[in-house]
């Protein structure tokens, strides 16, 4: 596994950079000395990001485009290489979602979620891979979701797109073994970004992320760590994230029982909202920058949730051990 502890001078394309994880990751990479090419549909937002990068002493090229349009993707990569002479890192961060029960979601919403979250990653990867192979090195860093290894009500299309993207990334990693090209993934928990202020909803009420919610900088710092030490999968909310993954593997029925009963309630408010399209097909003006209207969950609440998960996981593991011992005694 190649390491790049000093990122100064590397060139990165960051997609979905007009808000949220893409925006904050771009800033953190710029602080580490990475030269940026930022892209999204909203050029005015990208220009604001560029100003912040320049104020921090970084370099930033703005190249607006839509990840669902192959010509835009190819142009962004072409402009980046023409400007900097190469590209070393691709951060796939563009994402959308749509809230509603599966049979309520318009079919075009489902296909659009896949076109952005899944095929958008594919398009950019195919556009940069020839450059990576010619250079003999490169790094594909994909912003994934904890839902890539799980599920949630009201987010069936989003969760399915993330499952597909993680499977693709893991397969691509095997194909690229020994080429000098690395593949990394960040399994993102709920973070306070404008995504939840942009997303369409079929519910007639304002949606919110599944708690607990973390600050977006948690993910951006994980992106920088992976840029330095590529070829891994990072779970930024380490203890709680790992516990959730372990619990889902050890006793999936527990998570299923909780989410089927409370999952939809945890993601909705009593605030009426008529937003059937959101930013799926057309960019919206509001929600520029890294953070959204839903604040991060206070640390003490996250700690309490982690303790609860730890106790639940411990109980499941303990029950499994006792059950195994009983079975062994029975067959002796």
Regions found by a protein language model. Name each.
Residues 11, 18-19:
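Conserved glycine-rich cofactor-binding loop
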Residues 34-49:
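Conserved glycine-rich Rossmann-like NAD(P)H-binding loop of the short-chain dehydrogenase/reductase
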Residues 64-75, 107:
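The beta1-alpha1 cofactor-binding region of Rossmann-like NAD(H)/NADP(H)-dependent oxidoreductases
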Residues 93-98:
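Conserved NAD(P)H cofactor-binding loop of Rossmann-fold oxidoreductase domains
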Residues 101-102, 109-111:
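Substrate-binding pocket helix/loop in short-chain dehydrogenase/reductase
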Residues 125, 161:
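Active-site helix of classical SDR
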Residues 178-270:
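SDR active-site lid
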């Amino acid at each position: 596994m190649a390491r790049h502890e000093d990122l100064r001078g590397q060139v990165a394309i960051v997609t979905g950079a007009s808000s949220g994880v893409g925006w904050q990751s771009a800033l953190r990479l710029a602080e580490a000395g990475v030269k940026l090419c930022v892209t999204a549909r909203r050029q005015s937002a990208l220009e604001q990001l560029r100003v912040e990068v320049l104020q921090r002493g970084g370099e930033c090229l703005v190249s607006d485009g839509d990840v669902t349009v192959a010509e835009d993707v190819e142009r962004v990569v072409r402009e980046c290489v023409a400007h900097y002479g190469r590209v070393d890192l691709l951060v796939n961060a563009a994402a959308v979602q749509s809230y509603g029960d599966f049979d309520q979601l318009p079919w075009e919403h489902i296909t659009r979620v896949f076109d952005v979250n899944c095929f958008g990653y594919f398009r950019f990867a195919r556009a940069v891979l020839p450059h990576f192979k010619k250079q003999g090195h490169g790094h594909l860093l994909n912003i994934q979701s904890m839902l890539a290894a799980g599920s949630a009500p009201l987010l069936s299309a989003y969760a399915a797109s993330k499952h597909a993207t993680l499977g693709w990334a893991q397969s691509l990693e095997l194909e690229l073994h020994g080429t000098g090209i690395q593949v990394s993934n960040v399994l993102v928990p709920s973070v306070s970004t404008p995504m939840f202020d942009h997303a369409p909803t079929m519910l007639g009420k304002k949606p919110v992320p599944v708690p607990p919610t973390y600050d977006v900088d948690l993910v951006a710092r994980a992106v920088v760590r992976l840029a330095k030490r590529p070829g891994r999968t990072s779970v930024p909310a380490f203890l709680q994230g790992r516990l959730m993954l372990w619990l889902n593997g050890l006793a999936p029925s527990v998570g299923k029982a909780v989410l089927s009963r409370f999952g939809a309630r945890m993601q909705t408010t009593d605030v009426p909202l008529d937003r059937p399209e959101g930013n799926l097909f057309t960019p919206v003006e509001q929600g520029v920058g890294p953070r959204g209207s839903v604040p991060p969950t206070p640390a003490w609440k996250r700690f309490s949730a982690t303790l609860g998960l730890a106790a639940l996981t411990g109980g499941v593991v303990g029950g499994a051990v006792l059950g195994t011992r009983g079975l062994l005694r029975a067959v002796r």
